[in-house]
C-alpha cells in the first residue's frame, strides 16, 4: 500500500521563471557579493553579465548530459566566474552566498495551480509527503 508521496520542487510543485529584472538583479547581486569580499572584476556591467551567462551555459553543457549537479564552489569557480580568473579555491569562502543569492534573486518561484489543495488532500488521506530537490 502506498503511504508516501515524494515530489520534485521546481517544475512540479512550483513554476519557475526568469525576467529581465531578475537577470539584472542577480548579476548585481554577484557584483555586490564579490565587492563585499574585496573582489573587483574590472569589467563593466554588460561585460560581466555576458561572461556570467556564458559561464552558466558552459555549466549547463557539463551538467545536462551527466545529470549531475556540482558543489557551489565548483559551479562558480570552474564555470560561472572562470572568465575572471577566479577558481574554486578563490570562490570557496563565498560560493554558498553566491548560490543562495542566485536562487532567490534570479528565479521567480510560485506554486503551480491547485498544488496546495492537492497536498492538503493527500495529507487528509494520511499520506506522508516529501520534497526532493537539488536547490
Where are these regions (language model features)?
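Active-site neighborhood of HAD-like aspartate-dependent phosphohydrolases
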Residues: 1-50
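A short, structure-level motif marking secondary-structure boundaries and short turns
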Residues: 15-16, 61-63, 102-105
